[in-house]
Amino acid sequence: MAFHNRRWNFTFSCCVVVLLLPLVAARPQQPSAATRVHEEYSTFRVENTEWTFNHLAVDHRNGNVYLGAVNRIYKLSPGLDIQVSHQTGPDEDNRNCYPPRIVQPCSEPLTLTNNVNKMLLMDYRENRLLACGSLYQGICKLLRLDDLFKLGEPFHKKEHYLSGVNESGSVFGVIVSYGDASPDKLFVATAVDGRPEYFPTISSRKLTRNSEEDGMFAYVFHDEFVASMIKIPSDTFTVVPDFDIYYVYGFSSGNFVYFLTLQPEMGGGPTTGSSSAGREQVYTSKLVRLCKDDTAFNSYVEVPLGCVKGGVEYRLLQAAYLSKAGTILARSLGIGPDDDILYAVFSKGQKRRPKESSQESALCVFTLKEINERIKDRLQSCYKGEGTLDLAWLKVKDISCSSALLTIDDNFCGLDMNAPLGVSEMVRGIPLFSESKDKMTSVIAYVYKNHSLAFVGTRGGRLKKIRVDGPTYGALQYETIQVVDNGPILRDMAFSSDQHFLYVMSESQLTRVPVEACEQYSSCNECLGSGDPHCGWCVLHSMCTRKEKCERSSEPRRFASNIKQCVRLSVHPNNISVSQYSVMLVLEAHNVPELSAGVNCTFEDLAEMDGLVEGNRITCSSPAEKEVPRIIVDQGDHQIVQLYLKSKETGLAFANTSFVFYNCSVHKSCLSCVGSPYQCHWCKYRHTCTHDPSSCSFQEGRVKQPEECPQLLPADRILVPVNVVKPITLRAKNLPQPQSGQRGYECVLTIQGVEQRVPALRFNSSSVQCQNTSYMYDGMEMSSLPVDLTVIWNGDFSIDNPAQNKVHLYKCDARRESCGLCLKADPLFGCVWCKGENRCSLKQHCSYPQSMWLEHNGINSKCTHPRITKITPLRGPREGGTLVTIRGENLGLEFSEIKDHVKVADVECTPVPEGYIPAEQIVCEMGKAERSQFAGNVQVCVGECRPEFMAKSSKYYYFVIPQLLSLKPSRGPISGGTIVNITGGNLDAGSNVSIMFKDQKCTYQRRGGQWITCRSHASMQGYGNVSVSVYVDKAHIHKDLKFEYVEDPTITKLEPEWSIFSGNTPLTVSGTNLDIIHTPLIRAKYKNLETINICQVLSPTTMQCMAPELPYSISKHKDVPERPDEFGFILDNVQSVLALNNTNFVYYPNPVFEPLSVSGVQELKPGSPIILKGRNFLPPTPGGNGKLNYTVLIGDKPCALTVSDTQLLCESPNLTGRHKVLARVGGIEFSPGVVHITSDSPLSSTAVISIAGAGGLLIFFIVIVLIAYKRKSRESDLTLKRLQMQMDNLESRVALECKEAFAELQTDIHELTSDLDGAGIPFLDYRTYTMRVLFPGIEEHPVLRDLEVPGYRQEQVEKGLKLFGQLINNKVFLLSFIRTLESQRGFSMRDRGNVASLIMTVLQSKLEYATDVLKHLLSDLIDKNLESKNHPKLLLRRTESVAEKMLTNWFTFLLYKFLKECAGEPLFSLFCAIKQQMEKGPIDSITGEARYSLSEDKLIRQQIDYKTLVVNCMHPDNEKSPEVQVKVLNCDTVSQVKEKILDAIYKNVPYSHRPKASDMDLEWRQGRVVRVILQDEDVTTKIEADWKRLNMLSHYQVTDNAVVALVPKQVTAYNSVNNSTVSRTSASKYENMIKYTGSPDSLRSRTPMITPDLESGVKVWHLVKNHEHGDQKEGDRGSKMVSEIYLTRLLATKGTLQKFVDDLFETIFSTAHRGSALPLAIKYMFDFLDEQADKHNIHDPHVRHTWKSNCLPLRFWVNVIKNPQFVFDIHKSSITDACLSVVAQTFMDSCSTSEHRLGKDSPSNKLLYAKDIPSYKSWVERYYSDISKMPAISDQDMNAYLAEQSRMHMNEFNTMSSLSEIYSYIGKYTEEIVSALEQDDGARKQRLAYKLEQVVAFMSLES
């Protein structure tokens, strides 16, 4: 027994060892790394938000770019790839340390200080870079250009300190070369920041060859009295404390060096700083000139510069650039093309520094020649002794010029007299271009082909391209590009070395922009009309490009550079009817090149035909009949089609013209037919419009002119009273006489939507009459109703009605309840007031005699008993002038009747004609009343003052005396806007009130009995008191009231300068005169939306405000700070504080709270702290001192808080029970859940009894188990003895099986790869593919069809769904909706997947928005996963949330193209290889087991004898075609054979397009006459015991090379012999078979499909009897080998398929494969996951690796590998499915980071690929690494890609149906969703709950 056990163990171990042996196979080559594609728009972004960019320099020799930033200097390639980074800071420093601490110790406190780059210059001579910073008083580094190696950093002399100012735009340097003989000099100019004793403002320095030499940066000349520098005198700071000179630009030209400056004015203007009391400093822009060789700076001259355009002065210099003039501009300026010109950008006015200046700006140009001439004139006049030196900042006192006899030429460099010198008169530049909204901030220019081109950057981040042709020709802005999303473009811009690109810089990014983008223009006119001189039209290539890029551009007319050279095309005829075909057309082409290669004529995508070229004339035909487009009625009577000429040389269309196909039959009326611009004729008797007049029935029936059309003529108003029988006679012309068989005329009146047909009589061709009838309309709301009238004949032939004649039905008694209203009606109506009936009616309807009528203009036409119903106002001043409005009945029909007959309180009241409404209203103006008159009623007489014509009011009118008491406030800003409240008495009297502040109105707003409010205007008289007057009608109310205009308030400081997106954080505002504003408001504007919040004034200099929220819903869900576009205050009408230009106010992301737990309830013990988790709890403010005011309530009790960035620690109050937790901060209120505080308690007696009982049961159970174990042991011993007897029989068969497996391993690879051909891959279309992934198993989903609702509800439902669609597109709503659903217990996993898929179908057309929502949900999911203490690796492992399914769907949408172009091919090859390899051996059709398998579960574990046959099959569609040879097995069932035959015949046909095997019969043809139908089961089927075996080919004894055919399934009995010559008494066993009615589907699913016959109890089997049946005989089992012996076949199959698995894995895990680049979606999502990991400080590479694996490979690729039917139109059998599952498991193991320890007990599918998985893992790791190294995808590029994907597939799903499906969840959880929206602050502000309730109302509406 022991011996047999050892033999068994040895045998089993051998098989396992075979599985673990490595395969002898060639290793796949490693894929090459992805090659980076350089796009034209390259961008280099800041590495750290604090390291903003300052300066830029480009090496014109090699194109390398050098970038000066805060704390860094970078060397970049021309394509902006970083090459070297050099650190310059930060370091410990204090700006008051002089000399700096690196020279000697400093007593000032040191802080870590950033180093701002202030100057970056290329020293070409010494191949080094000068980089000067703000640290240590402005020392400079000299860096080697090649590698930024520090050559020197002189810092120990005072000359080495340029300036301690840390503003990057305040210093400028110019290196001047003097040739090889002399060293270069550095001219440097800098602001000094109030420390002139340390730093000269301008100086010239030495540049030594040795970068470490002491003399580096020494002054060129320096002695006791003279030096090469100028300092600002200290006296200047006495006059202007904040004086400084800011240097904007510098350059050298000729013998001079020039600097452009901005400096405060000394005289005349108010001062700045603390002495200014809020006044604004006036600045002047000046140019400074120095001689290059002047060591004493005697040549220093400065001249003011400015620009005036349209009467507006532009004086604040922003940027400048020196360039050559160029031919065209030079001609306009009167200078040479190589002369220097200076471009300068100025902003409007002279107040404020450039950063705070006006948005209005101008680009101007100066000629250096004119500037130098002006300087020379000034020098000459000064040296004649004229005037003063005019340099107030340098010479505080005016110094007169000294006279000297000398000649001053163009190169005069001054003497030690009359120097330095200023020019007082401004040099005016020539304005070229102005901008009022987006301030220009930078400029650069160059000359291209004689054109001068300026490139201007703006504050809004745009680049403007301007062609400058001078004052004669003007300037043209021909293109604008948005380069930077936020922030201005900085002054420094530079061209690439070849001038093809421009480097544009902001604080956060450097971008390389092409100087031209010709390819954006798609037509010649656009191209040459754009104004870009770079661009021309390459004619035959039909593209806009530079000339050098156009092939053969030098040949005549191949390249157009002028718009007149564009190809022009005309065609004759230029229109034809849609019913004309193959008409010859003649095209004339102008400006075409030689066309010897030939042309085609193309009618868009409708037709194409050859053209015959004869010179510039081309002849071609119009489309043939089948190609002519059919014109739809809704599209009008014509369709314009573009007719193109296509060059046969290039294959491109190069010219086009419009061609019209017209369709006369569209016209349904004569006038529209003959009025058509095309050749349309009207057939009068056929009532049709045609292009062929010969088709009309009669010659006289043809109409071509409008005058000949049958038509109704204009008629007077046709009045018809209702319910009165009356004919309607109409004038007409050309009325046709109905012919034989045609019907007569009818009138059709459409009354309230209902047609009423009336017979009509044609008197002649010019008259028709609608016969006697009566008409009626519903309702009494309308006194008359215009009704459409149509005259028709012959049933539906309508007569044209060009005058739109209508019938006016009317009712006398509608809306005419009184006599006056009745008589006021239109006299043509014939209405009378029937006094007896006291109503308005027609005369004939009044049953009383005429004496009892009143009618308009009749003998008796005056209504009696007028009545007054209302009077306003009821009070007024005695002085009169009050307009009294009297409403009533019967108040006369003419103004003359009441003109002098109105009295109010016995005072004449003069009626006003403009206010009189006959019978209804009188407006009259009150006269002056006597003092004795106090009150009275209103009296009106109509015509005469007899009682029956007189009306008196029941209410009295009173005379009152208005009075004034006081006004408040009594002072306000000079700009106005103050709401003034005036108190008094009777101030609501009268009809009109006006308030005057001296001679100016105070705009009236509201009033009551004791108050009036008005808004003050800006004062025209200046500061001081003004008298206040009030007028009520003609009464002037006297009171000595004064209002004082005072100086406008100012804002000087704001603390803190930040808030959160939701606002409502307290801000302290400092300023002046704040107490004069009674309702101050603070405002923010962002993305064109404005929000405001309240402020409270505390003192004249202080107020407290609550920050407004950032008014843009998307910003609330961002995780990056945002700056508002405008931030300021609404202080009455003070404009200067409306938008503060000097604030750096920033908004940080809102704090985000997480739920306390998944259930929302957290269990706590008393005294335990409550921890609220989230993020952004501490805004990342500069200095790190940003704190928010949090309030946390437990129930209604606050708790003490400790705050960190991600946690709020709340010391819970002494409470027990359940309490809601509520957190408040800023404008946010959030409840993270409920805490349940429970105290500990000892075990109850019940619990003790329960525990004791459970213990007793456990002991009893253990005893029972021991007894059972003993009995089982005995049975095992007996079984073991039986096994030993079988071992000897099995041993001999092991060797044979292993030998066969090895042979298959060596021979099958070649056979399989040769069988697979490159047939077309049956990809599913996009819609089917996405539906199978989104909604697996659902074939006809509602989202694929139109919404189906009952007709009566359609309109309401569609309205509701449109509103619902708007809500889904609101991010606040959608996120709240998803979160609410996920929090519901009844919301199942299936529901989550369904909702995610439905949302993605709705958002298919808005993938940018869908991506944003997905990122937000994933971010939430990550936060929740980490906070729930789950292991981070579990993230995205399963699909338990909407976000996870949305992620799958997102990849499904975006990877379709990649599947089709790249990954689909190896996946399809693998599927085919598996299918083919499986079918080479037996497959059990019942169990699905196979001889060849990768899955142990689907392996036939016994020896099956089989033989391969070849059958010749007739093609079912064409029996005459050659027979198809098909390999089958003699052990195949009939259904399996049918499937193999169909596979062979329809090899390249998608599975859904080929016949079903179940619809076909297999016919075995024996000779010409005998045909036997084969079946899986028939009367010959063998049944043994209770087992029935399916028929196989061996059962029917089918031989090799047998002829078979697939024929449609017959309805007669199966398996009958078709042999007319065989005797009916034949003994054939196939005769007289009964019809089989239970035939199964012939393995359409190819899964085990035949189940036991339930009626007979017979079990069906094929090759192996199912192991689940326990009645197998012992002998049957004994005939099998030990099943594990056959595991070697797994290895053989694996070896055969290895190449295909490797190909698939290599394709998926390569960043570039088969010519396809990595899909953007993968890079974008992986970067997002990395960002999230960084955010949560997760640096474990295994976690990051696992996140990415769970995100893409395990979520998308595994699904696709296991289910290739999602991608291809194929069928997947159960054995193929099992094999693919093994491949998928291997794929999953390859993505795992954990080590798999394998042994003999491990699953076979793990052992199978154990040796390959380490290699696959390395592929995955390299793949993730390569992706992380690739350049990040910008949001702009990703959004463009997503928009394109949306556009391509935007109509795949029915949005209405999708919305309807989503709405079903609204219906289920309405209350919960509405509640969540009401609790969400953002949703409340947008009233989303209300909008949802509107949707619910529409959707639930029943009628």
Curated annotation (Swiss-Prot):
Give the UniProt entry's GO cellular component terms.
Answer: membrane; plasma membrane; semaphorin receptor complex
Note the Pfam families from the entry: Plexin_cytopl, Plexin_RBD, PSI, PSI_PlexinA-B, Sema, TIG, TIG_2, TIG_plexin
- Quick check: keyword Lipid metabolism in the entry? no
Tell me what topology the record assigns in the membrane: Single-pass type I membrane protein
Q: Please name the GO terms that the record assigns under molecular function.
A: semaphorin receptor activity
- What ranges does the Cytoplasmic topological domain annotation cover? 1268-1903
Where is the PSI domain positioned along the sequence?
Answer: 517-567, 663-710, 811-864
Does the record's keyword annotation contain Transmembrane?
A: yes
Q: What is its main location?
A: membrane
**Please, one GO biological process term?**
axon guidance
Q: Could you list the residue ranges that cross the membrane?
A: 1247-1267
Positions of the Sema domain: 27-515
| Domain of life per record | Eukaryota
Tell me the disulfide pairings in this chain.
97-106, 132-140, 291-413, 307-364, 382-401, 518-535, 524-566, 527-544, 538-550, 601-620
Q: Where in the cell is it found?
A: Cell membrane
Topology feature Extracellular, residues: 27-1246
What residues are glycosylation sites in this protein?
166, 450, 575, 600, 656, 663, 764, 772, 981, 992, 1025, 1141, 1189, 1214
Keyword set for this entry? Cell membrane, Developmental protein, Disulfide bond, Glycoprotein, Membrane, Receptor, Repeat, Signal, Transmembrane, Transmembrane helix
The task this protein performs is described as: Involved in the development of primary sensory neurons especially in branching of the peripheral axons. Interacts with the SLIT2 signaling specifically to promote axonal branching of Rohon-Beard neurons and the trigeminal sensory ganglion neurons.
Q: Which PANTHER family match?
A: PLEXIN, PLEXIN-A4
Family (UniProt)? Belongs to the plexin family.
What this protein is called in its record is Plexin-A4
